[in-house]
């Protein structure tokens, strides 16, 4: 297997604190770049844990179609602005941020007061505009999760009339693109590839960490396959043949032979198939004549038994 290296050739932090990074991965065998690129992209875009605003509460508001006195934006606009906040929570529990701002003022994300477990990535993100003589009191709920979580209208969490739920987008990676370049090889060598991958995040995670977390996710996903243990299914016992199910009475044996076999708990051909000729001779009052009679009766229906136990 080829030993490849990973180089980050670009890294930028935008005004809104989003980050982008470009990575070169190679050299790779033909086809491996596509395998890596597709797998990493799927995890980066939907498999990483992130933080998002999941609900807000506005003082004096009990539904999303209301307006707030003295606030330029209606409640739907405030909901959308809060949904777009980039936050990074290090707590597995629900975190709540609060603000009370008196106008005139432009309310931004940096006005929210959270515990030390939550970082507001872009503090300049606008939330609302409050006019002179009015104020805005706002509560923002932040949680961690994976992927996209729509509002569950039937959940107990939505029962509070003044708690406005938000469809949560927990994905910290905004965009992933990759291209594949062929690299020069020595004469006679096989073709090599190089994967060029661009990762753009919302700033709550660096592109480097996003790539590393995706790789670890895939390692954990595939690791059990390396030690898979095959469990053999128990064998299915074959059903006895029709001949084996023939009752002892239908063999038309002599009364002496029949009675001796019955006393030995032999009731069908299936029971006789567990005997050898020597075993028959050991049955009480069962002589060679009776044993020969049984052998002949079995042969008539196409069944034979061994002469001795060792040949069974």
Swiss-Prot record:
A GO biological process held by the record: DNA-templated transcription
NCBIfam families the record matches: PRK05182.2-2 (NF003516), PRK05182.2-5 (NF003519), rpoA (TIGR02027)
The name this protein goes by in its record: DNA-directed RNA polymerase subunit alpha
Task performed by this protein: DNA-dependent RNA polymerase catalyzes the transcription of DNA into RNA using the four ribonucleoside triphosphates as substrates.
Originating gene: rpoA
Main enzyme class: transferase
Chemical reaction(s) catalysed: RNA(n) + a ribonucleoside 5'-triphosphate = RNA(n+1) + diphosphate
EC number: 2.7.7.6
């Amino acid at each position: 297997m080829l030993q490849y290296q990973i180089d980050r050739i670009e890294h930028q932090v935008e005004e809104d604190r989003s980050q982008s990074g470009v990575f070169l991965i190679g050299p790779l065998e033909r086809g491996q770049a596509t395998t890596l690129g597709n797998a990493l992209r799927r995890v980066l875009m939907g498999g990483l844990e992130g933080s998002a605003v999941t609900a807000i509460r506005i003082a004096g508001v009990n539904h999303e179609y209301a307006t707030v006195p003295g606030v330029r934006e209606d409640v739907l606009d405030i909901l959308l602005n809060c949904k777009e906040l980039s936050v990074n929570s290090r707590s597995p529990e629900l975190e709540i941020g609060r603000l009370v701002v008196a106008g005139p003022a432009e309310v931004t994300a940096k006005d929210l007061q959270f515990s030390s477990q939550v970082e507001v990535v872009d503090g300049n993100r606008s939330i609302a505009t409050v006019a002179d003589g009015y104020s805005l009191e706002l509560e923002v709920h932040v949680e961690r999760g994976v992927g996209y979580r729509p509002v569950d209208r039937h959940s107990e969490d939505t029962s509070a009339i003044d708690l406005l739920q938000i469809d949560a987008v927990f994905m910290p990676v905004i965009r992933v693109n990759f291209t594949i370049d062929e690299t020069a090889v020595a004469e006679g060598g096989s073709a090599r590839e190089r994967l060029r991958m661009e990762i753009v995040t919302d700033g709550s995670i660096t592109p480097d960490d996003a790539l590393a977390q995706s790789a670890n996710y895939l390692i954990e996903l595939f690791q059990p396959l390396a030690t898979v243990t095959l469990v053999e299914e128990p064998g299915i016992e074959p059903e006895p043949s029709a001949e084996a199910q023939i009752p002892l009475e239908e063999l038309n044996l002599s009364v002496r032979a029949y009675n001796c076999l019955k006393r030995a708990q032999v009731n069908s051909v299936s029971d006789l198939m567990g005997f050898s000729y020597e075993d028959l001779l050991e049955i009480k009052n069962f002589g060679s004549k009776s044993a020969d009679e049984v052998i002949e009766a079995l042969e008539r229906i196409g069944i034979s038994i061994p002469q001795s136990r060792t040949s069974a």
